[in-house]
């Protein structure tokens, strides 16, 4: 039996004239049909995830497919029991994917319509994973990798996507002469990053077409060789990919036990995404460090209306005190 809510993940690199007005008009339409989600619009294209019931999402797909240049836009569809978003946002940005090239002296930005890596089907990507002479590079943020990733994929030592070009240049000698294939959630980041690899001089560059989401839905590979869960940027947080032999790879921030539950650090000035159980969240006041646990703006403390005495008691239980520097 079909679930009542559909979640649509999509993007398309296509020139959009007067993109700011396009974004405003798009938001008005989405609100008029009761759609929820988050959409980025830029001169270079559109990138979004939205959710709604069958009728609402069908209206939206029909509307998008009626727009010039978007007739063939590819929607990746998940069925869920509940909405994946609480509100509707459509925002104009300079880019739908910010690789940070111009900000970091990496010359101009990449246009995927002109330069991008070769598309690999799920089966071709699986073959690449099994090929010892192929480098498989995860292009996502560190917390995304930690929740789940392809078996054997390289985890760049970076916090976010914008740091990836510099990391690759720093490790260029390790795989410049090898075949390099990249992957991301739905494909939008890889379109641009694989193009940058081509421009950097890599001769054999591939990308997982449709991203991890498509790989998990493919009837032939069924998500095999993916370990853990897929981090998604909505209320679901994590979704399944491997339907053959799933395992848990995420580890609790505090004790290293298997974990697939993400929270943001209680310190609003840190906000690090950490994997932790509800028990450890309570025990450590949702703080990723001592400094975050005792921060005067700790959200866990305020949300749970903890008194100073209760905070002191919990800190004492883990061998800490209210001092900024732990004993």
Swiss-Prot record:
Its EC number is 1.14.-.-. PROSITE patterns: RHODANESE_3 (PS50206). Coiled coil: none annotated. Transmembrane segments: none annotated. Keywords: Oxidoreductase, tRNA processing. The active site is at residue 184. Belongs to the TrhO family. GO terms for biological process: tRNA modification. It comes from the Bacteria. The lineage of its organism: Bacteria, Bacillati, Bacillota, Bacilli, Lactobacillales. This is tRNA uridine(34) hydroxylase. It comes from Streptococcus thermophilus (strain CNRZ 1066). SUPFAM superfamilies: Rhodanese/Cell cycle control phosphatase (SSF52821). PANTHER family: RHODANESE-LIKE DOMAIN-CONTAINING PROTEIN 7-RELATED, THIOSULFATE SULFURTRANSFERASE/RHODANESE-LIKE DOMAIN-CONTAINING PROTEIN 2. SMART domains: RHOD. Catalyzes oxygen-dependent 5-hydroxyuridine (ho5U) modification at position 34 in tRNAs. It catalyses: uridine(34) in tRNA + AH2 + O2 = 5-hydroxyuridine(34) in tRNA + A + H2O. Residues 130-224 form the Rhodanese domain. The gene is trhO. One of its GO terms (molecular function) is oxidoreductase activity, acting on paired donors, with incorporation or reduction of molecular oxygen.
């Amino acid at each position: 039996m079909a679930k009542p809510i559909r979640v649509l993940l999509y993007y398309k690199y296509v020139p959009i004239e007067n993109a700011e007005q396009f974004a405003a008009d798009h938001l008005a339409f989405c609100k008029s049909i009761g759609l929820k989600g988050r959409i980025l619009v830029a001169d270079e294209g559109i990138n979004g995830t939205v959710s709604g019931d069958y009728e609402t999402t069908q209206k939206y797909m029909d509307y998008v497919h009626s727009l010039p240049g978007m007739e063939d836009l590819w929607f990746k569809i998940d069925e869920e029991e509940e909405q994946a978003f609480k509100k509707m946002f459509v925002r104009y940005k300079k880019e739908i994917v910010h690789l940070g090239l111009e900000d970091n002296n990496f010359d101009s930005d990449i246009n995927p319509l002109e330069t991008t890596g070769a598309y690999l089907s799920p089966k071709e990507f699986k073959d690449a994973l099994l090929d010892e002479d192929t480098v498989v590079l995860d292009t996502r943020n560190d917390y995304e990798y930690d929740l789940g990733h392809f078996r054997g994929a390289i985890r760049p030592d970076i916090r976010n996507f914008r740091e990836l070009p510099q990391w690759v240049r720093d490790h260029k000698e390790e795989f410049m002469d090898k075949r390099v294939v990249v992957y991301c959630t739905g494909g939008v980041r890889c379109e641009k990053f694989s193009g940058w690899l081509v421009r950097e001089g890599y001769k054999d560059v591939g990308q997982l077409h449709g991203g991890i989401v498509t790989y998990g839905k493919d009837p032939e590979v069924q998500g095999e060789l993916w370990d853990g869960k897929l981090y998604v940027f909505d209320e679901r947080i994590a979704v399944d990919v491997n339907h053959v032999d799933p395992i848990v790879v995420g580890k609790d921030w505090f004790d290293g036990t298997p974990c697939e539950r993400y929270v943001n650090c209680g310190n609003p000035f840190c906000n690090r995404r950490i994997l932790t159980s509800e028990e450890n969240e309570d025990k450590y006041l949702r703080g990723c460090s001592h400094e975050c646990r005792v921060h005067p703006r700790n959200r866990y403390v305020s949300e749970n209306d903890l008194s100073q005495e209760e905070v002191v008691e919990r800190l004492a239980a883990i061998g800490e005190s209210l001092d900024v520097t732990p004993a």
